[in-house]
Regions:
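Aromatic-residue-lined binding/catalytic grooves and analogous aromatic/hydrophobic interfacial grooves
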Residues: 1-220
Length: 220
């Protein structure tokens, strides 16, 4: 997804995607003026998950544990890593408790790499090493530029998405915003909306469930 917005006379572009090819969430932020991008980034996690946040180099780590369910203690634990590449100054700021952050100053563009993993292997095996999984995936992702990561993700996604086409001609009603199209559907000739929502459903399924993972209807 891509969002563009203005703050004063500076235009910012923010692009986010979860890569099917590299198991990393990428958030790219760009400004149309040099050195106009500054921000800080940290974790906000419910205390029930017993989060532990730490910084090492330019990497921010959070470890947490699953919560008890119906009197049964959780055997799950998770880890999340965040690393930032930017053309400005990237600094790790350690703080007490879970307030540690990464800061970016005087940048024009920044790429945020987010990796998450758990010790879950399957429904009767939780012997996985969340920390090792995260480290291996982050090491792999950092070898690629933003452009390489984006291209690899699109190529992998299209292997599935491009299998099916549904073409229904657009009408004047199809030019409206999507929420307006949905609201007016029963009283319009906007049959192209059927194709749009059909492909949206495919996008959701492809993005939420892949071979080796959990079925979409088992994800909460």
């Amino acid at each position: 997804s891509t969002v563009r917005y203005k703050v004063g006379d500076v235009e910012y572009t923010r692009t986010a995607f979860a890569s099917l090819a590299d198991d990393v969430i990428i958030l790219r932020i760009e400004s149309n003026k040099k050195k106009a991008l500054s921000f800080s980034l940290g974790y906000d996690c419910p205390e029930a998950l017993q989060p532990q946040v730490s910084v090492k180099g330019a990497q921010l780590t959070m470890r947490c544990k699953g919560v008890e369910q119906e009197g049964i203690p959780s055997a799950l634990n998770a880890e999340c890593l965040i690393t930032i590449k930017a053309d400005g100054k990237v600094k790790a700021v350690a703080a007490e408790g879970n307030g540690s952050k990464l800061t970016v100053n005087d940048a024009t563009a920044a790429t945020i790499y987010i990796i998450g993993a758990t010790n879950f292997v399957n429904y009767h095996d939780v012997s996985g090493n969340a920390a090792k999984r995260c480290e291996e995936m982050m090491k792999k992702a950092l070898k690629k530029s933003y452009q390489q990561l984006f291209a690899a993700h699109v190529e992998k996604y299209c292997e599935q998405f491009d299998r099916v086409e549904l073409n229904i001609p657009m009408t004047k009603a199809s030019e409206a915003e999507t929420d307006v199209r949905v609201k007016n559907f029963n009283h319009s000739d906007d049959l192209n909306l059927i194709a749009l929502l059909y492909q949206y459903g495919r996008y959701l399924l492809i993005s939420s469930s892949q071979p080796g993972g959990q079925a979409a209807n088992l994800q909460g």
